[in-house]
Design a protein with these regions (language model features):
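Short conserved micro-motifs at the rims of enzyme active sites and ligand-binding pockets
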Residues: 378-380, 540
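Glycine-rich phosphate/ribose-binding loops and adjacent secondary-structure elements
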Residues: 16-147, 153-162, 172, 177, ...
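Iron-sulfur-associated redox domains of electron-transfer enzymes in respiratory
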Residues: 326, 343-344, 378, 414, ...
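Short glycine/proline- and acidic residue-enriched helix-loop micro-motifs
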Residues: 401-407, 564-566
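Flexible, glycine-rich loop/tail regions that form catalytic "lids" or insertion modules at the edges
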Residues: 1-28, 37-41, 47-49, 100-101, ...
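N-terminal small/glycine-rich loop or linker at the start of catalytic domains
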Residues: 4-28, 76-79, 288-290, 296-297, ...
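Anionic ligand-binding catalytic core segments
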Residues: 561-581
């Protein structure tokens, strides 16, 4: 390379040195040792490019996680005023998707060589006897896909170039100790501490054992199950057991047993009730009919889910006195004024389906600033789901993919939001106006601003909510648990003497009465449910909503598949009846 002093075209600008990120014991000491080695080479050898390489993994050598290595070295080089002298390149097998690349760049990496990802592409295609040119094309396509994902991540934050995104630290860090945050991710937001260096090293040792010693695993590489449930892999709350329990609505006590028996998978699972009050008769507790009024269906558009599912939810919610939500896809005017009418009409950045008649048919108008399933992005409906009817409802063209802009282009300040709230109240003076926010660190400040803009209700949407149309890259690593955002918003509103002005709602993964009660104790006054309702209507959690191939007719516009829809209004009502009774008990 041009950085090799023995090369004919040597240029000191490219002078580089490779540093292994392997270690034997003591993660923290190894990080500091690696940093000192890097710093000495920069100061003494005048290198311009630092290559952090994790290809030296062996039976005796473990690897420092690349985000820790990048973050630690980048941060300490800046502290010692030598960061500007070098570029940091990560030669790593840890980057396999846009998120993992974004983490390294945001915490200081200048460039990334994801060798394992490229090797996987070659390995996957070598059996097809492709020409060298075709194989190179596959690798380039992979690179284009990762770059496209990076651009989407940057666009969510309003950033146009990688140079601006680098060193931005635009992440909320959940579950790492204050010491690690201070050492490696100083500028990142962190509200919930957790693993220390010793804890991470134990996990590294376990993975190392599985790779080099444990011969009882079924596959050479663990499948993981990040997006889809795999037995023994990543935990999914809507796994087979809970999905089956929800489907058996006549015995929802089984669902309650599963939820309460899970091993602390969510923040709320760490909360135990503490009270010195004596039990009271259930006859003295708020009635089911009153509790029903606090229940809402989460926003799911007629388009992301089928007409049959959308109408069943609306009828069920209207029957019990709750509220269904149209989502951002408009609604058939023939449903207005009937049991099929959604009390909540959503107004999103794309304004799909928004007409004066649509707005005046609502009891509540919901401005979607963000949603838990894919915060920072607008709604997305693949063209395959936009049939003639959906196109008519949304006033668009059949077969064309519909993507709402990430921001509302008429909202760039609290004053702009106040203007939209005012305009909506002029169209429908009887409706309450709500603003939907996503749970994130700092949402409390935003909630206070929304209250000052005269919104009637604020919704805190958690990351555990589902989605009927989002691509896979939007499902993971976006948004925080509603528990964090709800507590922050509630406390911020109280601190600013605004809490009594607004109603607060929580949504995102609520399933049982204990979830509702814990949300209430954190400040929520009403509660929205999405995925459980679709599961009751027949959803099998296949995670193919975006393909328009839902085999049970819940999340598809394919007429043949919609004929297989077997959900009923009665089953939904049974679920909410169980839920309200569970809350009372």
């Amino acid at each position: 390379s041009y950085g090799d002093e023995n090369h004919d075209r040597y240029d000191s600008y490219y002078k580089n040195k490779t540093f292994s990120t392997s270690f034997k014991t003591n993660l923290k000491v190894s990080l500091e040792s690696l940093y000192q080695e890097v710093k000495n080479s920069i100061v003494n050898d005048k290198i311009s490019i630092v290559l952090l390489d994790d290809r030296s993994l062996s039976s005796s050598e473990k690897l420092i996680p690349m985000p820790l290595a990048i973050g630690y070295i980048n941060q300490h080089l800046k502290s010692d005023n030598v960061r500007q002298s070098v570029s940091i390149v990560a030669v790593t097998g840890e980057v396999y998707d846009p998120h993992s690349a974004a983490v390294l760049i945001a915490f200081g990496a200048t460039a990334i060589y994801p060798y394992m990802m490229y090797s996987s592409v070659i390995s996957h295609n070598e059996r097809k006897n492709l020409s060298e040119k075709a194989l190179i094309k596959k690798i380039k396509n992979t690179q284009i896909s990762i770059n496209g994902g990076l651009m989407k991540i940057m666009s969510k934050m309003g950033i146009a170039t990688v140079a601006s995104y680098r060193n931005s630290s635009l992440f909320d860090v959940i579950g790492l100790s204050d010491e690690i945050i201070s050492d490696c991710f100083e500028k990142a937001n962190s509200d919930l501490a957790g693993l220390c260096y010793e804890d991470i090293e134990k996990r590294i040792e376990l993975s190392h054992f599985d790779a080099f010693v444990n011969d009882k695993t079924m596959f050479p590489l663990e499948m993981g199950g990040i997006y889809k449930y795999i037995d023994g892999g990543e935990y999914h709350d809507f796994g087979p057991a809970i999905t089956k329990a929800i489907n058996h609505t006549k015995d929802l006590k089984g669902l309650k047993t599963l939820i309460e028996g899970r091993d602390k998978k969510f923040i709320r699972d760490f909360f135990d009730f503490k009270s010195d009050k004596k039990e009271i008769s259930i006859d003295n507790v708020e009635s089911k009919n009153e509790i029903f009024k606090r229940f809402a269906a989460a926003a799911m558009s007629c388009g992301s889910i089928s007409v049959e599912a959308h109408e069943a939810i609306a009828i069920a919610m209207n029957t019990i006195g709750g509220s269904s939500n149209s989502g951002e896809g408009g609604e058939d005017a023939a449903r207005f004024g009937t049991l099929k009418n959604s009390k909540i009409k959503q107004v999103a950045s794309g304004r799909f389906g928004v007409t004066p008649a649509y707005l005046r048919s609502a009891d509540e108008l919901q401005i979607k600033v963000a949603q838990g399933a894919k915060p920072g992005e607008g709604g997305q409906l693949p063209g395959s789901k936009v049939n003639a009817m959906i196109a008519t409802l949304r006033h668009t063209t059949e077969g064309v993919t519909l993507i709402s802009p990430p921001p509302h282009h008429d909202i760039y300040s609290i004053e702009d939001l106040a203007q939209l709230i005012f305009d909506l109240k002029q169209v429908n003076p009887k409706a309450t106006v709500t603003v939907k926010l996503v749970s994130t660190i700092g949402v409390g400040t935003i909630a206070a601003g929304v209250a000052k803009a005269y919104a009637d209700k604020i919704i805190i949407s958690g990351a555990d909510g589902g989605t009927g149309a989002a691509p896979l890259t939007s499902i993971k690593h976006t948004g925080n648990a509603w528990e964090l955002g709800l507590a922050e918003a509630h406390n911020s509103l109280k601190a600013n003497h605004l809490r009594e002005m607004v109603h607060v709602q929580a949504d995102g993964g609520l399933k049982t009465g204990i979830d509702v009660v814990k949300a209430a104790m954190l400040g929520a006054e009403s509660y929205a449910f999405g995925t459980p309702l679709l599961t009751i209507l027949g959803c099998k959690i296949l995670r193919i909503c975006h393909t328009n191939k839902c085999s049970v007719g819940v999340a598809t516009q394919n007429e043949e598949l919609r004929e297989k829809f077997s959900g009923t209004v009665e089953r939904l009502i049974e679920y909410f009846d169980f839920l309200a009774q569970d809350v009372r008990e």
